[in-house]
């Protein structure tokens, strides 16, 4: 029995940046540092930051006056930003720059009075933050999750209409929704390239290749990680059993019955240390070889805020 590791896998530039912001803030200012929402959707990462003194909250009313707060990689609404400013909280923004790009698209649409349609998952913090950039009551922003949702849209005119997408969606599903939107609203405008981020795209492409050569695909990632869930779904759609696991403790040995090659990947918020712990555990269950799938190299780096960067250089 062998293991085939997907490439690329694991941390993306936005996740690296977000974790660095929390760690540097703790190093410079000391604990506690408050973080609004899980900075990234991975239990192992969050538990590690908690141990260093990060305090995770869901709303700013849980943050004491005058404290330091970090916004998660998923981004926040303008209302949250205004509340932080009103209360005089010291803010470090860990919003992924690729999410910020979508925020700017929404803000421009709001300012111009253009109706906006966001393709995304209802209730996901990125979606909540993105929709919260729109405040034009004379137009409006609407959420669709699927092709079926398009028929329910309360939008009759295609004039001054634009769309954008959550950054961690299924490429295939999103393409279907965009095609259906353009069919219903031929004049709808959108980004030249969809907003699904490079890391999501690369990891989904790697899973396609992984599934072709595996009888089981294990995706290392937490249950609340959107991009990790999409990886597991994609492998399943290709006819290969897939499991989303937080770590080796989640592996059921019965999954390995009749399996010759186990494909392993990791969501963009899952650290490589977890992947290696899964590999080592599988070796105790009969794995004898480990190889890497060829894939694209990622060199993207996002800088931390200047105040933290100066300290980092020192």
From Swiss-Prot:
Disulfide bonds: none annotated. Isopentenyl diphosphate binds at residues 41, 74, 124, 225-227, 269. Dimethylallyl diphosphate binds at residues 41, 74, 124, 225-227, 269. It holds the Pfam family LYTB. The active site is at residue 126. [4Fe-4S] cluster binds at residues 12, 96, 197. One of its GO terms (molecular function) is 4-hydroxy-3-methylbut-2-enyl diphosphate reductase activity. It catalyses: isopentenyl diphosphate + 2 oxidized [2Fe-2S]-[ferredoxin] + H2O = (2E)-4-hydroxy-3-methylbut-2-enyl diphosphate + 2 reduced [2Fe-2S]-[ferredoxin] + 2 H(+); dimethylallyl diphosphate + 2 oxidized [2Fe-2S]-[ferredoxin] + H2O = (2E)-4-hydroxy-3-methylbut-2-enyl diphosphate + 2 reduced [2Fe-2S]-[ferredoxin] + 2 H(+). Its EC number is 1.17.7.4. Its cofactor is [4Fe-4S] cluster. Binds 1 [4Fe-4S] cluster per subunit. Keywords: 4Fe-4S, Iron, Iron-sulfur, Isoprene biosynthesis, Metal-binding, Oxidoreductase. Belongs to the IspH family. Catalyzes the conversion of 1-hydroxy-2-methyl-2-(E)-butenyl 4-diphosphate (HMBPP) into a mixture of isopentenyl diphosphate (IPP) and dimethylallyl diphosphate (DMAPP). Acts in the terminal step of the DOXP/MEP pathway for isoprenoid precursor biosynthesis. This is 4-hydroxy-3-methylbut-2-enyl diphosphate reductase. It comes from Actinobacillus pleuropneumoniae serotype 5b (strain L20). The gene is ispH.
